[in-house]
Amino acid sequence: MTAVSQSSGQEQRPEEVCVEFCDVEKSFGGEQKILDGINLRLPAGTTTAVVGESGSGKTTLLQLVNAVLRPDAGEVRVFGQPIPQDDLVSFRRGIGYAVQGAGLFPHLSNRENVELLAKLAGWSASRREARYLQLLAMMGLDEEVSDRYPHTISGGQQQRVGLCRAFMLQPRLLLLDEPFSAVDPITRIGIYQTFSEVKAREGVSSLLVTHDMREAARLADYLVILARGRVLQEGTVGDIIAAPADDYVQMLVKEQL
């Protein structure tokens, strides 16, 4: 199944859609709209990549899904339900978040970084330990990184620790904000492979935002091209290569694929 825009007319049961944007608009300070009339339906169990330059609105999309921001107009639904107005703590436990540069707390050990949200969620020490060791193994990390601090391990290891944290609470949905851009290209390829394997094993739906078309093509089942707060084109990689919607999309294809 692929993601479809609302205008396509394709019927999907609510439980098949992990995130839905319905006529969503967002602006800051009354200035130009950051998001302008976004309509998207993203299928559960897949990875959708939103590709765009800085300022295109792609990070704002993630912040709306995670309820860090609220839309000025329209609605965002997660697994068929409107984002709640209260009890956001429980809502966010179903969402994992991975960011550029891993976003680890420097004063916590790598283990403490990964286990923090589970501890706050009331998980027992034994449950946290079992899940932590499971993720460490899946991410290809040695236990010796556990009691070290983020600055004492490589950038690639930090990124893997950050992904462990994102997967810790067994989320249904994973939000990825350019999480691999801070590591070198060779290391990145290995992390791509590991991420894809763990995501498939965990059965997680994911929404990736990136400026890198090659990264999107490597990781995603479906692409959304965003510019100036509007969706320019959506489709599979093959669809977009075969028929770019405009000059900007054609430039992305020629320069990055």
Task: Briefly describe each language-model feature range.
Residues 66:
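Helix-to-loop junction immediately C-terminal to a conserved catalytic motif
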Residues 74-82, 91:
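Conserved ABC transporter NBD signature motif
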Residues 126-144, 196-197:
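Conserved ABC ATPase "signature" region
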Residues 149-153, 157:
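Conserved ABC ATPase signature
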Residues 170:
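Conserved catalytic motifs of ABC-family nucleotide-binding domains
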Residues 234-235:
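ABC ATPase "signature
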